Amino acid sequence: MPLLPMTKLELGHRGEAWEPGCLRAVAGELLFTFLFVFIGVASTITAGKAAGGAGEAAAVTAAAMAQALVVAVLATAGFHVSGGHLNPAVTLSLAVGGHITLFRSALYVAAQLAGSSLACLLLRCLTGGAATPVHALADGVGPVQGVAAEAVFTFTLLLVICATILDPRRAAPPGTGPLLTGLLVGANTVAGGALTGASMNPARSFGPALATGEWAHHWVYWVGPLAGGPLAVVAYELLFMDVEDAGGAHQPLPQE
């Protein structure tokens, strides 16, 4: 089987860091990830308080709705700027697919982590030091189980991105990919909220951990997504992508 376009790595070069398009894209990832984490964490705090006696299920459902909306809106808003990744797992998975160079992906990840950290630190200031929700394993869920769960959730996330955004033969109308991705994030949050919190995003987990100093099992939220995401990209390419129908190449996410 020939090496397919979606499974090619491109190293890139340091000069990319000074290209105007790259600078705009990195700034976009910082800004949109900041907004994503700020709204996401704030909504989780609010959902927990509002649920009150309704219990954990109501809080998870409310948080899932908020996550779905904020991902759909901000991924759409940032799509033409940087691709609207908002997530190191998405960025590194797309690097595996050759849609972004490894050098630029490193800049994206740094910007995403910075945006997440700033969002959580600001939120702690605005809430008077109120407890910041941190992704953690539920009782009875071990680290290996947590990694597996996060890998599966992130696998589905990247599979949807491949099918609705990257594949030129996609059935989804143009521009609806980020919306469908947001809906999937909401569904995964409901499914995995009571297990691992269904992060699917190392940056989303990093900011709260940094702001609170709670690092227990934090590595789970890196290993799981970074295993599941790239696997989905490779699997989609090998199993479902028809290179001849696609004209021999995928349409890369916009980088400028």
From Swiss-Prot:
Subcellular location: Vacuole membrane
Taxonomic superkingdom: Eukaryota
Chief location bin: membrane
Coiled-coil segments on the chain, per record: none
GO terms for biological process, alphabetical: water transport
Record field: transmembrane: 25-45, 59-79, 86-108, 146-166, 178-198, 220-240
Pfam families: MIP
Keyword Transmembrane helix assigned: yes
Entry keyword set: Membrane, Repeat, Transmembrane, Transmembrane helix, Transport, Vacuole
Presence of keyword Transmembrane helix: yes
GO MF terms held by the record: water channel activity
Family annotation (Gene3D superfamilies): Glycerol uptake facilitator protein
Chain ranges for the short sequence motif NPA 1 as given in the UniProt record: 87-89
Known tissue expression: Expressed in roots, leaves and anthers.
GO terms under cellular component: membrane; vacuolar membrane
Motif (NPA 2): 201-203
Membrane topology type: Multi-pass membrane protein
Free-text comment about domains: Aquaporins contain two tandem repeats each containing three membrane-spanning domains and a pore-forming loop with the signature motif Asn-Pro-Ala (NPA).
PANTHER family assigned to the protein according to its UniProt record, in alphabetical order: AQUAPORIN TIP4-2-RELATED, AQUAPORIN-8
Function statement: Aquaporins facilitate the transport of water and small neutral solutes across cell membranes. May be involved in transport from the vacuolar compartment to the cytoplasm.
Entry's family note: Belongs to the MIP/aquaporin (TC 1.A.8) family. TIP (TC 1.A.8.10) subfamily.
Protein's name in the database: Probable aquaporin TIP4-2
